[in-house]
Amino acid sequence: MASGVCPPAELGFGAEYYSVVNGVCSRAGSYFGGRPVLTQAVGYAVVLGFGAFFALFTSFLVWLEKRYVGSQHTSEWFNTAGRSVKTGLIASVIVSQWTWAATILQSSNVAWQYGVSGPFWYASGATIQVLLFGVMAIEIKRKAPNAHTVCEIVRARWGTPAHLVFLTFCLLTNVIVTAMLLLGGSAVVNALTGVNVYAASFLIPLGVVVYTLAGGLKATFLASYIHSVVVHAVLVVFVFLVYTSSSKLGSPRVVYDRLMAVASAARDCSADLSRNGQACGPVAGNFKGSYLTMLSSGGLVFGIINIVGNFGTVFVDNGYWMSAIAARPSSTHKGYLLGGLVWFAVPFSLATSLGLGALALDLPLTAAEAAKGLVPPATATALMGKSGSVLLLTMLFMAVTSAGSAELVAVSSLCTYDIYRTYLNPGASGKQILRVSRAVVLGFGCFMGVLAVVLNVAGVSLGWMYLAMGVIVGSAVIPIALLLLWSKANAVGAMGGAVSGCALGVAVWLTVAKVQYGRVNLDTTGRNAPMLAGNLVSILVGGAVHAACSLLRPQHYDWGTSREMITTVESVHAALDDELKEERLVHAKRWIVRWGLVFTAVIVVAWPALSLPARRYSLGYFTLWAAVAIAWGTVGSVVIILLPVAESWTTITKVCAGMFTNDAVYDRLDDVNLRLRAIMGAMPEAEKRYRQLHETEMHPAGTHPANDDDDDNNNNQMMHS
């Protein structure tokens, strides 16, 4: 192409990414060029600085609550947060726990690959599990109110063999999720700053281990809220930057026009203008090759894999069960529904902005760079410079550490209650359990780093692990769901379904890779066809085997033993007993079933169905689409930031008053006095004994008031005589 037409005339933008070489207009070979955007100093500052800050700050918040509110840091408190967490904080925890590195990176990658359908299918395919899990959260309150883990319920209902099978699946899920978090976190820190990937693997968990050791699940929840605030603040910045304020984009019209131009059939995509898998021209598998359509075969296949795979990451991850256990009974269903709806905005709004923004800017990203998750940092850097990269790196660090802390406590709880208390020391005291819980947190924190290094050496990527997880643990989803939902569920069927589903899923996955691509390796097993087949076989076989066995030999269960066998080590909050009444929980179940199914139908069926007639979007339709992304992201961010503060305002004011006055001390003394009066009123002997001790301490031997009275009477008589 002649030097006078560079960049190509059909674009008219992105000139900084084109140059004339030997008289020919050529596009840059990549965006990053293999060089980190930021210095190593910035990387270490984020990983170590933020890690230390949140470790100290979260531990300080936990201490404040203990000092001025009077929280008792028992083993029950460490592992269940007192079972009294309110709606806003539970929703914040769900959002934070479900926001992985993949949520931020992979969602924008599929936007870069498939256009508007990518962010939608990523968000909807991973939201419905949280909405539907709200039903399980209520059922655990109804049928096993004292449970610490889902595996305790398995043992109470199906016995020791089933307990060991599902304990293995739950621990495997936690290990895989942790591996994904550290693989994604270390890879991005390395790509953006040049920090050694192995060093990042060990340094990222460091701060998480410190505050989790100090405060257990409550510290994890507090940290999750703080991390959610940062993630959503950055989210809003990027969304408004792309669609309202950026000088390079700044409006839906500009983004729309440029998306039409970059996918135009008239665009020249010859060798010098499109290399290394760069986005150029019509999109294969999309309607008219456009990025502006939901009619995308690639997007649909990704959506199916995403939906199937993510059921395993929710239903078999003990972290979600712990969040349900920690919630107040009156807050459980609302927290999960709100958390799911707010989380939808993270991948949808962010990828609709940064993912489509990368295309609209015509960034010379290669397929390899996109696979590493570098689409969002590329767009952020192009629009804001290095400050954009710092913002995105901070956002990613928050996502990885927050979800990682939840996995730490989940593993700690499984090892403590399902191994130590069940098989090693059934009579363990609260102090012993607390000691073991903290030891497991420390041990698993170290194991996290070693595991990430091993997987990095083996060449396993975040994307491969993300897609493969459903194949490995998806078979346990339906048996675990039926554990609480079906009174006839059979123990043998549950074990057989979970094990056979996993085995057949892996076999089909590897077979399809071998048949279709001629070899089995990380590359072929990570492609769409083998992953789709393996995920579907795993979850469907697991469910079918369990259902068939349960229908042939039903194992009726009335939930009596689950209440008798699963006990707390220390007493729990008696004030919550009223919320555990059956009629209130049944009402909550009906509420979450109704609204969970409604929103699932809207997100998975109605929304895409209504988008299909639009085919290739018009400017007006795309403007509406962008407006929904902006509004959902903004409203969700406001709710998730302000609601926990509003619900905890009484506690916040009490802590603040305690820090600057003695009011909190007097309030606690009054409370203790009131409790003692209630006890003494119910026990007359205690009242009598108290008065005797009080008189003895106030009047030592020989100075009893009665003796003084006698002396006064004698003196008076002598005077009268």
Swiss-Prot record:
One of its GO terms (biological process) is urea transmembrane transport. Keywords: Cell membrane, Membrane, Symport, Transmembrane, Transmembrane helix, Transport. It comes from the Eukaryota. The keyword Manganese does not apply. CDD domains: SLC5sbd_DUR3. It is found in: Cell membrane. InterPro entries: DUR, Na/Glc_symporter_sf, Na/solute_symporter. Expressed in roots, leaves and shoots. Residues 699-721 are annotated as: Disordered. Signal peptide: none annotated. Disruption phenotype: No visible phenotype under normal growth conditions, but when grown with urea as the sole source of nitrogen, plants show reduced growth and slight yellowing of shoots. Pfam families: SSF. GO terms for cellular component: plasma membrane. Induction: By nitrogen deficiency in roots. This is Urea-proton symporter DUR3.
